[in-house]
A protein has these predicted regions:
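Acidic/polar loop-and-plug regions of large Gram-negative outer-membrane beta-barrel proteins
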Residues: 169, 174-191, 274, 279-352, ...
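Short, small/polar-rich motifs associated with maturation and membrane association
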Residues: 1-250, 255-258, 262-267, 354-355, ...
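Extracellular/periplasmic, surface-exposed regions of secreted and cell-surface proteins
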Residues: 27-30, 73, 79, 203-208, ...
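Core alpha/beta catalytic barrel or barrel-like domain that forms the active/cofactor pocket
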Residues: 291, 390-392, 507
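Conserved small-residue
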Residues: 133-187, 277-306, 314, 440, ...
Length: 665
């Protein structure tokens, strides 16, 4: 059995680093729309949490804890290409996933691997007759455990107690609540408004459809997949919340020239396309979001008035101010607010295209050159319409409707060249060597984004929510745009795997990364690693345990990884054009727009470095029916890249520096 490692594969029993393998069948069994959702509970040492609970939204993931001040997301390598979007993949397209957890395993990826590496292999072509497979499943989702909220009776008791504590008396609730309804509240026959239940979408549907076609012969193989996923939100009753995605995948490999059993020249490609649409309730943060609004809402008041319109707290004003405050008047009707704000009418769309082409040349036995170029293109758009409304006099209103439209697109490319040589000495000494280089490029002319916001539209609905349809009295129109960021990265790497009779293993890796995010004096970072393993079960003195002990391996490793995750070109000063850059020059009666500095330079910025020591044991018992793996590790990250408050006399608010240390064990 082999596992995927950086830029190649290796026998599983010879791996000296800490890795996890998850097979595609185990992912597909989970029946989820997201790959990372399927990995939950299958990857020890990897913490995976939903970012928001919104259908189709991504996940927060950390491998062995948070070791950096920036994002804890690992590096995703999809079909040999770094930096892919795992959230764009259809779980049914996955052949296998390998997780590299320690620095000894990750060092081959250098600066991008400080948070670990997740290697994704999509389904490849297989030799044999053409096979067509269609998988479909339909399920329903419900809120597993609903928060226990105060009933109307409990809420009134709490408010009365608050009044007592402030030196007052109990409220006369009959002033604000209909007599029959008040009696029902007080005797417990009516618990009041359950705001969470009001927005809960019971039996929210989730469905997956996947069509896969594979086939080929000894010279040509292919695999094609088409998928469609749809998911309803469990909090999408009043405002629609859903996610839908279409995916297409085509992988093929062809032997161009063969000598005997050796494939001298092979070519292939991996193409993946995704189109996604989503809409949903406003997420916000832990203090400002739809769910928290429902949790704080008063159970004594209804969702609707008797006339069928949304209940408004201003309706209670004439009944007496003391009781009015007991109804949390400064919090508007949360469902009405949800409908009239961003949750009410919004839609996001995105397109992703990943294309990889490669050539493999094997001029002699054991020597293989691989040249690969990867192209990524993406675009996204988001539209939102906010209608005119008034819920109370405390600010929960909008005098003019508002529409927003954001569009962005971009592309980048990566060139990778590797040379792999495998050879043996005296049959017992096995060597697997690799050298390579990689170049990544993204430039301002490779993409851009444009954002527009207008107050006042002609048609007053979401279907026509475009800036070009603003009315003649539109105010506060804001249009902004910017090019894609500039970043280039050049890397060189080498690896040597050695084993003696598959009992004693040694791996050494070195990678050098140069990034445009740092000044020429600090541009290059060097990240080494070394690891060793001992397959004890292969020793002669262990022969007596062969009936119950299948495999026993000790391993240890040390390595370094880097991180350059910060906005581009922070090491040098920047300039900006705008309202703060106006100059009178020779005419004191009018100003001319010019440039002004917008950030402090720091030419001393350098690589953030993560150093890790790992010791582990792998065992298998009873003919593979029972397995056990344990790891001890110590990870220390130094020279953290952080944005700190700048000295006030500089005229700037923040500056990027290296500072701080984080340790994980």
């Amino acid at each position: 059995e082999v596992v995927v490692v950086g830029y190649g594969v290796q026998k599983k029993k010879l791996v000296t680093g800490s890795t996890i393998e998850v097979k595609g069948d185990d992912i597909q069994k989970m029946n989820t729309t997201q790959v990372l959702g399927a990995l939950q509970s299958q990857t020890p040492g990897v913490n995976i949490q939903a970012a928001s609970g919104q259908p189709g939204d991504g996940f927060k993931i950390s491998i062995r804890g948070a070791g950096t001040n920036s994002s804890t997301a690992p590096l995703y390598v999809i079909d040999g290409v770094s930096g892919g979007d795992i959230n764009a993949l259809n779980p049914a397209d996955i052949e296998r996933i390998d997780v590299l957890k320690d620095a000894a395993s990750c060092a081959i990826y250098g600066s991008a691997a400080a948070n670990g590496v997740i290697l994704v292999t999509t389904k490849q072509g297989k030799m044999g007759k053409v096979q067509v497979t269609y998988d479909a499943n339909v399920g329903w989702q419900n809120m597993y455990k609903k928060p226990q909220l105060l009933t109307a009776k409990q809420y009134m008791a709490v408010q009365d107690q608050v009044s007592y504590n402030n030196g007052g008396s109990a409220y006369d609730w009959s002033k604000y609540i209909d007599a029959d309804l008040l009696n029902a509240y007080q005797d417990g026959s009516n618990a009041g408004t359950d705001w969470i239940d009001a927005i809960r979408n019971k039996n929210a549907i989730v469905t997956n459809h996947s069509l896969n076609v594979t086939g080929g012969n000894d010279l040509s193989k292919f695999s094609m997949g088409v998928g469609y996923q749809y998911q309803d939100g469990v909090l999408g009753n009043v405002v629609k919340s859903d996610f839908r995605r279409f995916t297409f995948r085509l992988n093929s490999e062809h032997v161009v020239y063969r000598v005997g059993k050796r494939d001298v020249i092979k070519i292939g490609e991996n193409v993946y396309y995704q189109h996604k649409q989503n809409q949903g309730v406003q997420i916000g943060n832990q203090y400002s979001n739809v769910l928290s609004d429902m949790l704080r809402a008063n159970p004594c008041v209804p969702i609707y008035n008797k006339d069928g319109n949304y209940f408004m707290y201003d309706d209670l004003k004439n009944s007496g101010s003391a009781g009015w405050f007991a109804f949390n008047s400064y919090t508007s009707n949360p469902i009405a607010s949800m409908v009239n704000n961003q949750s009410g009418a919004n839609k996001g769309k995105s397109f992703n295209l990943n294309a990889v082409g490669y050539t493999e040349i094997s001029p002699i036995e054991g020597l293989t050159y691989r040249g690969q170029i990867a192209y990524k293109q993406w675009s996204n758009s988001w539209r939102c319409y906010l209608a005119e409304y008034r819920l109370n006099d405390q600010g929960a209103s909008r005098d003019k409707d508002q529409l927003s439209n954001n569009v962005g697109l971009g592309w980048n490319w990566t060139l990778t060249n590797t040379l792999n040589y495998k050879f043996n000495i005296a049959k017992l000494h096995h060597f697997d060597t690799l050298v390579g280089m990689e170049y990544y490029k993204s430039r301002p002319d490779y993409g851009e984004s444009v954002n527009a916001t207008v107050n006042g539209s002609i048609f007053k609905d979401f279907a026509h929510a475009y800036p070009s349809l603003a009315d003649g009295n539109a105010v506060a129109s804001v249009v902004t745009g910017e090019p894609a960021g500039y970043e280039s990265k050049l890397s060189y790497f080498a690896r040597v795997n050695y084993d003696f009779d598959e009992k004693y293993m040694l791996t050494a890796i070195i990678r050098a990364d140069g990034s445009s995010n740092f000044s020429p004096d600090h541009r290059w970072g060097y990240f080494p690693s070394v690891s060793a393993g001992w397959v004890i079960s292969n020793e002669k003195f262990m022969e007596s345990t062969a009936s119950w002990l299948d495999f026993l391996k000790l391993r240890a490793g040390w390595g370094q990884n880097g991180n350059c995750n910060l906005p581009s070109s922070q090491w040098r000063a920047g300039f900006e054009f705008g309202e703060y850059g106006v100059y009178p020059f020779n005419d004191k009666t009018s100003n001319t727009t010019g440039a002004y500095p917008n950030r402090l330079s720091n030419p001393l910025l350098a690589w953030e470095t993560s150093e890790q020591l790992n010791i582990g044991i792998d065992t298998r018992f009873l003919h593979g029916r029972l397995g056990f793996t344990a790891d001890w590790y110590s990870k220390k990250t130094k020279d953290l890249l952080i944005s700190i408050q700048a000295n006030a006399v500089s005229g700037f608010s923040t500056q990027w520096v290296n500072g701080g240390t984080v340790e994980n064990k």
